[in-house]
Amino acid sequence: DERVEYKKLMKQFGNEGNTEKYEYFKKRQLVQKILLNSMYGVLGSPTFRFYDVDNAEATTLTGQMLIKYTQKTCNEYYNNELKDDSDHVIYTDTDSIFVSSVPIIKKRFPNANIEDDSFMTDKILIVAKEVQDHLNQKYNEFAKLYLNCDKHRFDIKQEVIAKSAFWVAKKRYGQWIINENGVTCD
């Protein structure tokens, strides 16, 4: 998968401090993402040579079902850890969820300074890895239960750490990103 390779190179060059190559591979992986998403979209267009409304619907509905399952499973993980029944997922998008690690960090480290970016980044990465591993394991159950398949390509990864964010409408939001794909940002 070219996009996976580009993302690896993006992270590698970001960690090495090679901004030029980091930006190059960041753009390359984004192009791959857009091409793939466009292919899914064009399947539902009657003017497309390989038009297939069943495949277009299956792609859309599987994605919607998976993101709802991801939200539910993530909330269950947080509820179990925090012993509450709150909704901890802040926002879901087509292929991602936004959730704050602050409640878990505050529970684990009650005297922590949550304004300390270095401390918080380290702890957020730990919490994100735990949640990510839990979700990816649960995707096996999802595939068997809802799709009747043993093999799948579902994989969720933590991508950004934002110090703050705001949402004005669906798909219209801003984030103060301090870490992207494991690379510290200014």
Task: Cite the ranges covered by each PLM segment.
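Conserved acidic
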Residues: D1-D186
